[in-house]
Amino acid sequence: MEIRVRHLPVVSSEMELLGVLSEGQLLDADNPDVLVGTLIGVEPVSISEHAHVFEATKVLMDHNLTTLAVVSESGRYLGLVRRHDLFDRFARMLATQESGAIISLEIAERDAALSRIIHLFEQNDVRVLSLSTEAHNDAEGTIGVTIKVNVREVSRIKHLLDHNGYKVVAAFGEDEDPEDLLDRVQEFMRYLEV
């Protein structure tokens, strides 16, 4: 698989990060014999080797880069992180490869006790695989909460949340097979007759 990058770090022979060169800078160069060092002019954008993935993503987005240089505390170039690498990391953090239902809620910011939601799930033998929040810039002061759980049956999860006063905006997963549900109801009716 080919992944296109538009920004490459420029380093000295001592592995000191000198700058970042963009594809546009190379294409705009009038002289094909121009030295790379003359094309880089600004302070190099980099991230510490100890930085969190959130910080790396913020720097990439703030500077509209496709790669981000990683440097040691002494400024030595260690490597680079690509947008694609961060995307893969977030996919793992959000448990996208795990089987289960995805539920999107809208809750008032003042009621945003996520521990209550998690406790509610745990009481009902549902394990939270991932949870993320997103602030909505609306007058009502709501936030979006997206939760991935280890069960696939959406109807049970929706009922649980609705019953506890949560507004389910969307739910993705599998609903129970109506035939299975009908069979269980019939078995229950036979049980009651006995």
Say what each PLM segment does.
Residues L129-L131, H159-E179:
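Conserved short beta-strand edge segments in small beta-sheet-based binding/regulatory domains
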Residues S12-E14, S72-S74:
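Short acidic/glycine-rich beta-turn/loop cap or linker motifs at sensory/regulatory domain boundaries
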Residues M1-R6, S13-L18:
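A positional/architectural concept
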Residues E140-V151:
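Short basic, glycine-rich beta-strand/loop surfaces that mediate nucleic-acid
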Residues M1, G19-L65, E73, Y77-A139, ...:
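Tandem CBS (Bateman) regulatory domains
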Residues P9, S132-N137, I143, A171:
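Structural preference for solvent-exposed beta-strand-turn elements
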